[in-house]
Amino acid sequence: GWLLVEKLRDGHATSVGAASGVVAGLVAITPACGALNPLGSLILGIIAGGLCALAVGLKYRFRYDDSLDVVGVHLVAGVWGTVGAGLLSTTTGLFYGGGFRQTLLQIIIALVTIVFSGVITLVLGLILKATMGWRIDKDAETSGIDQEVHAESAYDLNASSGGRFGGAFADAG
């Protein structure tokens, strides 16, 4: 699903898109894994990939910070997997003759989960703001938070990149 959206939207599919699509499928199947057959699982995963690829693109339009695409992948795929279980369940799913009841229950539980998670996140965020603050000071941001807090950098930007296998292997001795 993700690769198809990339191909249609951008003219090419990417390896990052392939990996993100796999993650989206795994997230989506998690709430539905005990209720779907293999075909339903494939359908759920393919749709999850497409929905998440579209959702990740929205962060640029709405200008919100989601550097790891947590909202676009985990929230969207999780909600789709929860609702999709109500549609594709082999015992109670709408598409298997189970009626709309299970789908409605799945929608309700997805909404309850979103509200619960939002409230808990807000409370924890306010506690953090009151105790530590949400932002680091400008000097720490300029020098790098890894250096400021841990006295080290996550990346050795001065490493040699020579040698057959790059700097890390060349310097390893």
Protein language model features and the residues they cover:
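Glycine- and aromatic-enriched membrane alpha-helices
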Residues: 1-173
